Curated annotation (Swiss-Prot):
Belongs to the NusB family. Gene3D superfamilies: NusB-like. Keywords: RNA-binding, Transcription, Transcription antitermination, Transcription regulation. InterPro entries: NusB-like_sf (IPR035926), NusB_fam (IPR011605), NusB_RsmB_TIM44 (IPR006027). Involved in transcription antitermination. Required for transcription of ribosomal RNA (rRNA) genes. Binds specifically to the boxA antiterminator sequence of the ribosomal RNA (rrn) operons. Transmembrane segments: none annotated. This is Transcription antitermination protein NusB. One of its GO terms (molecular function) is RNA binding. HAMAP family: NusB. GO terms for cellular component: cytosol. The gene is nusB.
Length: 140
């Protein structure tokens, strides 16, 4: 697993645990940061988590617009957490190609989700990318 893959896995766990345990972001983030030995990874995890929660209303709105016959709250906690992470990356991390974001999200869905999670996540994120990803990301 690459450093960035590991980082995404840990960010997913922060998002998931925050909702599952209903702890503060700071508490969950602190717990997760103890796992990481790399200063760079800690900085990336912190940037992602802060970025996700600072932009959560916009992220959730864009996900919701790409769901067909579903509401965001009806999604499993795993799928919702993955979609939030990947949507943040699609919209706000300009150096990450769209294909990498989708591939990494699918891998997290295969690891933690249900049998159908990876296909569902891929389909929703494809719509998010086509509808909302910055134009310059399409050429990375």
């Amino acid at each position: 697993m690459t450093r960035r893959s590991k980082m995404r896995d840990l960010v997913f766990k922060v998002i998931f645990q925050n909702e599952f345990r209903n702890d503060s972001i700071e508490t969950v983030l602190e717990d997760i940061l103890h796992i990481s030995k790399s200063g760079l990874m800690k900085a990336d995890i912190t940037r992602y988590v802060k970025g996700i929660y600072e932009n959560l209303p916009s992220i959730d709105e864009k996900i919701s617009l790409c769901l067909e016959n579903w509401s965001l709250q009806r999604l499993s906690l795993v799928d919702r957490s993955i979609l939030r992470l990947a949507t943040y990356e699609l919209l706000y991390e300009s150096d990450v190609p769209i294909e990498v974001t989708l591939d990494e999200a699918v891998e997290i869905a295969k690891k933690y989700g249900t049998e159908n999670s990876s296909k569902f996540v891929n389909g929703v994120l494809d719509k998010v990318a086509k509808s909302f990803a910055p134009e310059e990301k399409r050429y990375i």
